[in-house]
């Protein structure tokens, strides 16, 4: 399908589960031939089925899902990953759709700096007609560059976080200098933000050790939608196994990865998530202009 916006790289599968976009990086696929993307999607079904076997299915289905519990994921790379003709065409529609649905907003970072600045500009534009701020997630650049970025985003930010898992992300590899952050560096970053601090990309035992030491305001469980080279596994299973421990060291848990339906959202909330984040379905819904239908799949009030 070709439109004035470009050509969507998503294959528009009937079920978005990571099997239709194998090897598509750049694009909307994942590393390891999409393995973690696939496991993320399957993980919510497995958790629900396990709960169902214990007689807890009705308890999960009874959980009310309202827009305030959902966020659009932090997304950049509209040209190379999504298929937009121009990077600037993506951010305002994507964030505006989420804001109008009542969802929280997340804004991502990328290379070149224009990508972050376009996200900032979109949030600024939204504030001409509503009052809204976003959670901004910065790539793990060297500290001085991060401090500069904090100044760009702080007026429009409700939360500021770092993608700790993206220091070796395939789509930015060899383009910029990214670092694997230490606890001391994260503490230094946090002190500069002066806002609620999020560690995004928590998915391994090493990440858990960082959380214990830093004790952020928010832990964001993520494997970058299966797009970073990390251990094999699903965010759903990590949430189920680690939520009770993580709660000791943070105020909230956010999670993404494979969220497609209301039942997925309910399952995430049941297993300990405070906020549930979706990206690929909302990207496609923005491009194809069927956002209302996608919202109905994710929630009810």
Indicate residue ranges for each PLM-predicted region.
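Catalytic cores of alpha/beta
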Residues: 144-154, 203-216, 241-255, 259-276
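Hydrophobic, well-ordered secondary-structure segments
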Residues: 225-244, 248, 252, 288, ...
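Thr-Gly-centered strand-to-loop micro-motif
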Residues: 199, 229, 255-256, 278
């Amino acid at each position: 399908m070709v439109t004035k916006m470009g050509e969507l790289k998503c294959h528009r599968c009937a079920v978005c589960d990571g099997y239709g976009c194998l090897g598509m990086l750049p694009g909307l696929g994942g590393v390891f031939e999409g393995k973690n993307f696939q496991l993320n999607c399957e993980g919510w079904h497995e958790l629900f089925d396990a709960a169902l076997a214990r007689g807890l299915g009705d308890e999960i289905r009874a959980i009310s899902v309202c827009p305030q519990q959902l966020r659009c994921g932090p997304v950049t790379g509209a040209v190379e990953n999504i298929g937009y003709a121009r990077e600037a065409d993506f951010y305002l529609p994507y964030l505006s759709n989420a804001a109008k649905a009542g969802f929280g907003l997340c804004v991502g970072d990328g290379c070149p700096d224009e990508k972050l600045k376009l996200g900032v500009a979109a949030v600024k534009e939204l504030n001409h007609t509503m009052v809204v701020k976003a959670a901004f997630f910065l790539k793990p650049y060297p500290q001085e560059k991060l401090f500069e970025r904090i100044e760009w985003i702080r007026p429009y930010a409700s939360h500021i976080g770092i993608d700790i898992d993206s220091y070796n992300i395939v789509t930015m590899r060899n383009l910029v200098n990214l670092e694997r952050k230490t606890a001391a560096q994260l503490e230094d970053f946090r002190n500069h933000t002066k806002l609620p601090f999020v560690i995004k990309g928590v998915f391994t035992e090493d990440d858990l050790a960082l959380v214990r030491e830093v004790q952020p305001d928010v832990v964001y469980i993520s494997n970058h939608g299966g797009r970073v080279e990390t251990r094999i596994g699903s965010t759903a299973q990590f949430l189920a196994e680690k939520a009770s421990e993580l709660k000791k060291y943070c105020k909230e848990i956010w999670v993404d990865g494979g969220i497609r339906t209301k039942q997925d959202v309910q399952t995430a909330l049941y297993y300990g998530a405070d906020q549930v984040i979706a990206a690929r379905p909302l990207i496609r819904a923005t491009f194809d202009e069927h956002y209302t239908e996608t919202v109905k799949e994710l929630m009810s009030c």
